[in-house]
Swiss-Prot record:
Transmembrane segments: none
Protein name: Rhamnulose-1-phosphate aldolase
The keyword Transferase belongs to this UniProt entry's keyword annotation: no
One GO CC term on file: cytosol
SMART domains: Aldolase_II (SM01007)
Textual note on the cofactor: Binds 1 zinc ion per subunit.
Active site: 115
Cellular location(s): Cytoplasm
Name of encoding gene: rhaD
Origin organism lineage: Bacteria, Bacillati, Bacillota, Bacilli, Lactobacillales
Organism: Enterococcus faecalis (strain ATCC 700802 / V583)
Length: 279
């Protein structure tokens, strides 16, 4: 069967096209990695046929033998649909965790995204929390990026602002938003910082840069970032209209959490409200 007909390739094509349409992945900005199961690739590829090996600059032993489809370095999301094999690659992490075995794509000696260290470290962190985690997505969601210039970069305060902008936010990301300091992209340092935040939050903000999101499937991750971005957009409108005059109270957020069976990140809502609702 043609690899281009594989459901996971089609998902990557549709998602990158949509992200480019939204303006969140200008030029070659943004990247996606998708953890694949061997049974998913077997109808389309022979895993013993390695096209070439690509060295890595960090130890990925914890992902040894695992398969991924990833976006390429310097590749434009707008081109993925028409030239998938040039802009995407299916890889396996070698048994020693020091190199990648290319099984398909990344033609003309292309290499995976320069953010692969951050992706792989985030996969490792999230798999330790949720063994079903499969997607890591990075993009430059416009309003979240803008908020990193104008809003206090305290995780609790930032998260609460988003929760209060749209009722669905607490339901979609009760674990809040992690925030790292500004760091040089494409380095192991930013990967380590991101992965540390991923232990507790599925969303991590890179100030003055973009957002990282993780989840079990493409819809979940895209929806996660999309929801936070919508809240950031509403925040932008609210500020432009003169600021907040009324919002969702902590008491109402507790009621919301109870109704949808989610647990807000500890300490992010007024504890006295939590106790009152238990009486």
């Amino acid at each position: 069967m043609n690899v281009l007909q594989a459901p996971f390739v089609e998902e990557m094509v549709k998602t990158t096209k949509n992200l480019y349409r939204l303006g969140w992945d200008e030029r070659n900005g943004g990247n996606i990695s998708y953890l694949l199961k061997e049974e998913e690739i077997l109808p389309f590829l022979n895993p013993t046929q390695v096209l070439r090996k690509i060295p890595m600059k960090f130890d990925a032993t914890k992902l040894a033998g695992k398969y991924f489809i990833v976006t390429g370095s310097g590749k434009y999301f707008k081109n993925v649909c028409d030239a998938s094999s040039e802009n995407l690659g299916i890889l396996r992490v070698s048994e020693n965790g020091q190199e990648l075995e290319l099984l398909w794509g990344l033609e003309d000696e292309a290499v995976p995204t320069s953010e692969l260290p951050s992706h792989f470290m985030s996969h490792i962190a999230r798999l330790a929390v949720d063994p079903e985690n499969r997607i890591v997505m990075h993009n430059h969601a416009s309003h979240l990026l803008a908020m990193s210039f104008t809003h206090e970069l305290d995780e609790k305060v930032f998260t609460r602002t988003l929760w209060q902008m749209c009722t669905e936010c607490l339901v979609v990301f009760p674990d809040g938003v992690g925030i790292i300091p500004w760091l040089v992209p494409g380095t192991n340092e930013i990967g380590v910082a991101t992965a540390e935040k991923m232990k507790e939050s599925r969303l991590v903000l890179w100030p003055q840069h973009g957002i990282y999101g993780t989840g079990r499937d493409m819809d979940e991750v895209f929806g996660l970032i999309e929801t936070a971005e919508k809240a950031a957009e509403v925040y932008t409108y609210v500020c432009a209209q003169g600021g907040v005059r009324q919002t969702i109270s902590d008491a109402d957020l507790w009621r919301l959490a109870e109704a949808f069976g989610v647990t807000p990140k500890v300490g992010y809502l007024e504890e006295k409200v939590s106790k009152r609702r238990k009486l």
